[in-house]
């Protein structure tokens, strides 16, 4: 009898969707995750004499190991020697200790009940390696002692969240933009196309813009007080007196938080290929930085996201063979079997936080309509709400784990004990 014991809703399966930018976790069957906190975590390594700073809200790692500061409130407090690190690289787990710290934190602070009571469905990158999948399976069963486990590709979950089992998922997150063809609930590996032009790339472009405009980036943690100043006038603010010696990685993280707010508030994708004249006619957007400096942004707000669609005019991209967003989609479809292409063009599903830049989907729709073969019907599926687009793979996981028909799919503890960690390759496509 394979895992038939678990009925979806009664057990309260947990769904984890851990991305490069945020961690989303919650109970299956609910419509949005219970928690959503940054994947970046603060890490303080003990000093040589074995003393650490006062522990208040840190999660102690292994004995004598580093102390981790997780979730926004703990991470954004300036501390001496605290590095901001990310457990993921290229969408896959790289640093297992800090990854485990994130899971510990979620269980302790948010689930607040024994890990052994809840089956876990976890999302994974479509290019995750066999070794990492097996290691994760082993961690969940051996360390957390969970009753059942399942790993599912993010793209498949996004398709399910949109009520489809076939479609082309265009996922643009923090570290990369990918087009992933899904057919009948399976990822077609040969059709995956990845581009590094995504949210972090836009953050870098914004940083360069601020340098050109001589705008000083001051994260809020440095500011004691500020005065209102007129538009374009130099900022008038006072620095906090007693600031600890922070690390460069952490200061950088705090600066990026400011830039990401700017990205979400100001940037917009131009309707058609960027044109100086047209951009100059667009309405400007007023933005105030944390230190009180404020000004209007005009053409710049269209110019920065242009790199996503037309990488050719971005300076500093070497040899520039990168693909714009719409090229990523058409290239991916072109690598799939000719018979399934209509099904892919017929549901291009847009997901990921980076696609929330204003007018992103309009521009994508426009470019794809020009590139789609006349014999095929193009349909772009993009949720209007930020929640559904940012959490799409979590929502798909929530739907999947609470389906009655899914309950026989879990890898049960018993199966794991009999077949070892290799069973993940067999049971989770």
UniProtKB/Swiss-Prot annotation:
Subcellular localization: Nucleus
GO biological process: one example: DNA recombination
Keyword Membrane: no
Gene Ontology CC terms, in alphabetical order: npBAF complex; NuA4 histone acetyltransferase complex
Modified residues (Phosphoserine): 86, 233
InterPro entries in the cross-refs: Actin, Actin_CS, ATPase_NBD
The keyword Ubl conjugation is assigned to this record: yes
Primary localisation category: nucleus
N-acetylserine modified-residue sites: 2
Cross-link position per record: Glycyl lysine isopeptide (Lys-Gly) (interchain with G-Cter in SUMO2): 62
Gene3D superfamilies linked: 3.30.420.40, Actin, Chain A, domain 2, Actin, Chain A, domain 4
Keyword vocabulary terms for this entry: Acetylation, Activator, Chromatin regulator, DNA damage, DNA recombination, DNA repair, Growth regulation, Isopeptide bond, Neurogenesis, Nucleus, Phosphoprotein, Transcription, Transcription regulation, Ubl conjugation
Function: Involved in transcriptional activation and repression of select genes by chromatin remodeling (alteration of DNA-nucleosome topology). Component of SWI/SNF chromatin remodeling complexes that carry out key enzymatic activities, changing chromatin structure by altering DNA-histone contacts within a nucleosome in an ATP-dependent manner. Required for maximal ATPase activity of SMARCA4/BRG1/BAF190A and for association of the SMARCA4/BRG1/BAF190A containing remodeling complex BAF with chromatin/nuclear matrix.
Family, similarity comment: Belongs to the actin family.
PANTHER family: ACTIN
Subunit composition and interactions: Component of numerous complexes with chromatin remodeling and histone acetyltransferase activity. Component of the NuA4 histone acetyltransferase complex which contains the catalytic subunit KAT5/TIP60 and the subunits EP400, TRRAP/PAF400, BRD8/SMAP, EPC1, DMAP1/DNMAP1, RUVBL1/TIP49, RUVBL2, ING3, actin, ACTL6A/BAF53A, MORF4L1/MRG15, MORF4L2/MRGX, MRGBP, YEATS4/GAS41, VPS72/YL1 and MEAF6. The NuA4 complex interacts with MYC and the adenovirus E1A protein.
Protein name: Actin-like protein 6A
């Amino acid at each position: 009898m394979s895992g038939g014991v678990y009925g979806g809703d009664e057990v309260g399966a947990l769904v984890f969707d851990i991305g490069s930018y945020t961690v989303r976790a919650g109970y299956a069957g609910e419509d949005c995750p219970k928690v959503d906190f940054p994947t970046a975590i603060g890490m303080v390594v003990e000093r040589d004499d074995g003393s650490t700073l006062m522990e208040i809200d840190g999660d102690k790692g292994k004995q004598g190991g580093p102390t981790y500061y997780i979730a926004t409130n703990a991470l954004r407090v300036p501390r001496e020697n605290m590095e901001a690190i990310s457990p993921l690289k290229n969408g896959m787990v790289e640093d297992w200790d800090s990854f485990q710290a994130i899971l510990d934190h979620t269980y302790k602070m948010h689930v607040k009940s024994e890990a052994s009571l809840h089956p876990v469905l976890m999302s994974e990158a479509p290019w995750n390696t066999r070794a990492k999948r097996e290691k994760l399976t082993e961690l969940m069963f051996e360390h957390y002692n969970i009753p059942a486990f399942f790993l599912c590709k993010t793209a498949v979950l996004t398709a399910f969240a949109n009520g489809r089992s076939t479609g082309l998922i265009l996922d643009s997150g923090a570290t990369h933009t990918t087009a992933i063809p899904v057919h009948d609930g399976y990822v077609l590996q040969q059709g995956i196309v990845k581009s590094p032009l995504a949210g972090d790339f836009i953050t870098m472009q914004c940083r360069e813009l601020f340098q050109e405009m001589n705008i000083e980036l001051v994260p809020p943690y440095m500011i004691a007080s500020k005065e209102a100043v007129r538009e374009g006038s130099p900022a008038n603010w006072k620095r906090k007196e007693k600031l600890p010696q922070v690390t460069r990685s952490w200061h950088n993280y705090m600066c990026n938080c400011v830039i990401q707010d700017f990205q979400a508030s100001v940037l917009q994708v131009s309707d058609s290929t960027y044109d100086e004249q047209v951009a100059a006619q667009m309405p400007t957007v007023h933005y105030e930085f944390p230190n009180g400096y404020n000004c209007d942004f005009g053409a710049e707000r269209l110019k920065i996201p242009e790199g996503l669609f037309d990488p050719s005019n971005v300076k500093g991209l070497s040899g520039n063979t990168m693909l714009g967003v719409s090229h990523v989609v058409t290239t991916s479809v072109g690598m799939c079997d000719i018979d399934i292409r209509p099904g892919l063009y017929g549901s291009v599903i847009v997901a990921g936080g980076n696609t929330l830049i204003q007018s992103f989907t309009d521009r994508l729709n426009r470019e794809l309509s020009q590139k789609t073969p006349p014999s095929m019907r193009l349909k772009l599926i993009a949720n209007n709400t930020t929640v559904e687009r940012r959490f799409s793979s979590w929502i798909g996981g929530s739907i999947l784990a609470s389906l009655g028909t899914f309950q026989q799919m879990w890898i049960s503890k018993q199966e794991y004990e009999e077949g070892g960690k290799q069973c993940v390759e067999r049971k989770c496509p």
